[in-house]
Amino acid sequence: MTKHRVVVGLSGGVDSAVTAHLLKQQGHEVVGIFMKNWEDDDDSEYCSSNVDFVDAAAVADVVGIEIEHVNFASEYKDRVFAEFLREYQAGRTPNPDVLCNAEIKFKAFLDHAMRLGAEKIATGHYARVRQNPDTQLFELLKGLDPAKDQSYFLHRLNQAQLSRSMFPVGELKKTEVRRIAEEIGLPNAKKKDSTGICFIGERPFRDFLNRYISKEPGNILDDRNRKLGKHVGLSFYTLGQRSGLGIGGVKEKGAPRGGGDHDPWFVARKELDTNTLRVVQGHDHPWLLSQSLLADQVSWVAGHAPAEGKAYGSKTRYRQPDSPALISGATPEGFRLDFPEPQWAVTPGQSAVLYDGDVCLGGGIIAAVDPH
């Protein structure tokens, strides 16, 4: 194995900690960097950055590597958070983790690491990279642990980024990562996994959004134009949402799915022109099912779109099982996906990602659903 100078992104979590340990064991020259990507809440109960850095520094001490604290908050605010707010204000539901990976962890962080003389960077993502022996192209693969695979969030990475990236824990199950952490005495071996969007932390999402987006209340209507209540603003809801609607509809035990009087309500549409939130009853209501989508902001791992006329695996949300999809009309600006089986709550602003088996091909941002 070729030995490299590798800069590891140490987050304070167990995955990046084991990543650093594995690389050190393999004989690489390893340096740790803690990325501070958000500082608006430094004095808030919701900010874990200071605690995370203490954990990361303790990990570096156990592993036996140096660690540097680097502030990327300005880049994050300009490249990720500003786009996050624009998307919500436009009525879509963005995934900032996808943009953070492309713009911060594998661009700003990568550039910083290269300036330090690194040949590679490594993170604790559950994914894999390999170079195809026939095409010599770098491929992004799913992590071996299907319950933890994070290739969906990495689908915008290009050849230059992948060629310099390493994901050691992508070859392991999460249980193995925890076991290694305990065996070598890592102080964060039992630290719980982080959840949610990094700059929101554990606070209620609506409370956070209130600080940046003004409320524009409007009507909540069902599929028969019956008024059921008022919403606080379309930006605060996402397709498929069930809780927080304030209109009741608790499902009775044994009630049928698909529109019974006692079925729960789900957000089905956001009509921006009339500021109307449309809701329907039943998980399998036709308004929640989609046969096709259009995507823009395209990024293909290989640098070009996959061949048409073949069914690929697809995901329109994280942790969704792969669903067959046919791609057509692919241009540098966008593509269309058609689904043999209807997909539930396909949401504009989220990513549509294609797979050929375990190989992540890339994808785009969902712009329209069931276009005519």
From Swiss-Prot:
Residues 148-150, 317-318 are annotated as: Interaction with tRNA. GO terms for biological process: tRNA wobble position uridine thiolation. Residues 95-97 are annotated as: Interaction with target base in tRNA. It is an enzyme of class 2 (transferase). The keyword Oxidoreductase does not apply. Disulfide bonds join 100-198. One of its GO terms (cellular component) is cytoplasm. It is found in: Cytoplasm. Its EC number is 2.8.1.13. The keyword Nucleotide-binding applies. GO terms for molecular function: ATP binding; tRNA binding; tRNA-uridine 2-sulfurtransferase activity. ATP binds at residues 9-16, 35, 124. The active site is at 100 (nucleophile), 198 (cysteine persulfide intermediate). Keywords: ATP-binding, Cytoplasm, Disulfide bond, Nucleotide-binding, RNA-binding, Transferase, tRNA processing, tRNA-binding. It comes from the Bacteria. HAMAP family: tRNA_thiouridyl_MnmA. Belongs to the MnmA/TRMU family. This is tRNA-specific 2-thiouridylase MnmA.
